[in-house]
């Protein structure tokens, strides 16, 4: 199993989990095709992490790309940056800028 992570990505975890659902239990080639045509920002981030995990497998262990499949995709919540927007009568409303930690684990297909 080969792992790649991206931390503190400025994508809401809720939206990133939608993109993660596109690639679960697929081969690496199929997952890359799914993410290529995804319109989500999280899809682009997950594709980079997937490519990194595949590169780890190919370069470190000489595994063929065709034999790899996505074993696990995890999207965890990172820290939340808090900002404020001014409102009427001296008030304020909070703006929460959420971040995500993305983890992709790939491995050889079970036969």
From Swiss-Prot:
Identify the Gene3D superfamilies for this entry.
Answer: Ribosomal protein L22/L17 (3.90.470.10)
Q: Known Pfam families for this protein?
A: Ribosomal_L22
- Does the entry feature the keyword Iron, yes or no? no
- Keywords annotated in UniProt: Ribonucleoprotein, Ribosomal protein, RNA-binding, rRNA-binding
| Superkingdom of the source species | Bacteria
Which Gene Ontology cellular component annotation is one that this UniProt entry carries? cytosolic large ribosomal subunit
What role does it play? Answer: This protein binds specifically to 23S rRNA; its binding is stimulated by other ribosomal proteins, e.g. L4, L17, and L20. It is important during the early stages of 50S assembly. It makes multiple contacts with different domains of the 23S rRNA in the assembled 50S subunit and ribosome. The globular domain of the protein is located near the polypeptide exit tunnel on the outside of the subunit, while an extended beta-hairpin is found that lines the wall of the exit tunnel in the center of the 70S ribosome.
* Name of the protein this chain belongs to: Large ribosomal subunit protein uL22
Question: Where is the organism placed in the taxonomic lineage, from the top?
Answer: Bacteria, Pseudomonadati, Chlamydiota, Chlamydiia, Chlamydiales
